[in-house]
C-alpha cells in the first residue's frame, strides 16, 4: 500500500541516486531485527529446478544487488531466489555517469552501468555474512579491461571463489555494456567458454563435494539461427539451465519517448513480449532438455504466467520491482 508514495519520492531523484539511497537503507536493516519492516509472508510454492528446490518460482534478477550487500533484507520480501552480481574478478567503476535512465511512461529502464562492482572477494565476504534460506544465485562476468580472447579466465577465477557459497552460478555473456562480451554467445567462442566452465565445474565438484549448477544468461536480440546454435551448445556441454533474457538494444517500442535514444540495454515492460518470444522459441528448441529461467518485463501476475506458459520453469523480476515495489512479489507468488 505504501510503495506508490515511496516510489513518488524516489522518482524525484536521479535513478542511480535513488538506487543508492534505497540500498543505503536496506544495508542498515539487513541482518538485523529491523528486517521486519520489509518482511512479507508469501505462500510456499516449491519448484524443483536444476537439482535445487526453490521455495517459490519468483526470483530477483541480477543487477540490483551487484555486491550482495542486502541479501537478507531482499530475502525477507519473499523472493524464492536472489541472483546477486554481475561480479567480476577485480573491482571496477563501470561506465561514466549518468548511466541509468527511466522511461517512466513505458515503465522501462535503460542502463549502461558496465558491471560496476567491488570485486568477487568483497562479494564473497558479504555472502558469508548472509542468512538467507532461499536459493542464492551468483552472476559472474569479465572485467572490462580483460581482452575478450582471455575472457574465460575471468569466469574461471570467479567460479573458484564463489563455488562454495553459490546455490547456482549464472554466466553473463549477454550484457550489451561490456565491449565484445556478446561475441562470447556465438560459435567457437561459446564452445571454448562452455568447455572451460564445465571442466572447472567438474574440478570444483570434486574439491567441494557438492554440485553447483550453471546457468547461462542470453540476450533477447539473437536471430533464429543464433538461438538454435546457442541451444545446441548449451545441450552439448551439459549446461544446467538458461536465463532468458538480458536487456535489449531494440528501441522499436519506445520511439519518441524521453531517454529512448540513450545508449545501453533496455529492460522493463518494452522488453516483455520480445523476451517471452525468445523463451517460447528456446523452449521449442530445447524440448525439455534443460530448464529456462524467464526474465524480461515481468510486472504482473499475467506477465509471469505468460513466461511460464512459454516454457519457463522459474521467473525473475528487476524493472517491475523498481516500478511496483515489494507488493509485486507477494502478488506474483500468491497468484502465479
From Swiss-Prot:
Q: Which GO terms describe its biological process?
A: 'de novo' pyrimidine nucleobase biosynthetic process; 'de novo' UMP biosynthetic process
| Pathway(s) annotated for this protein in UniProt | Pyrimidine metabolism; UMP biosynthesis via de novo pathway; orotate from (S)-dihydroorotate (quinone route): step 1/1
For this record, an example GO cellular component is:
cytoplasm
Any one GO MF annotation of this record: dihydroorotate dehydrogenase (quinone) activity
Q: Which InterPro entries match?
A: Aldolase_TIM (IPR013785), DHO_dehydrogenase (IPR050074), Dihydroorotate_DH_1_2 (IPR012135), Dihydroorotate_DH_2 (IPR005719), Dihydroorotate_DH_cat (IPR005720), Dihydroorotate_DH_CS (IPR001295)
Keywords for this entry? Cell membrane, Flavoprotein, FMN, Membrane, Oxidoreductase, Pyrimidine biosynthesis
Annotated cofactor note: Binds 1 FMN per subunit.
User: Which reaction is this enzyme known to catalyze?
Assistant: (S)-dihydroorotate + a quinone = orotate + a quinol
Top EC class for this record: oxidoreductase
Q: Name one Pfam family in it.
A: DHO_dh
Membrane topology term reads: Peripheral membrane protein
Chain sites annotated for binding FMN:
62-66, 86, 139, 172, 217, 245, 268, 297, 318-319
Q: Which residues form the active site?
A: 175
Q: Which residues bind substrate?
A: 66, 111-115, 172, 177, 246-247
Q: Where are the transmembrane segments?
A: none
Localization:
Cell membrane
Q: What does this protein do?
A: Catalyzes the conversion of dihydroorotate to orotate with quinone as electron acceptor.
Subunit structure as annotated in this protein's UniProt entry:
Monomer.
| Protein name from the UniProt record | Dihydroorotate dehydrogenase (quinone)
Q: Which gene encodes it?
A: pyrD
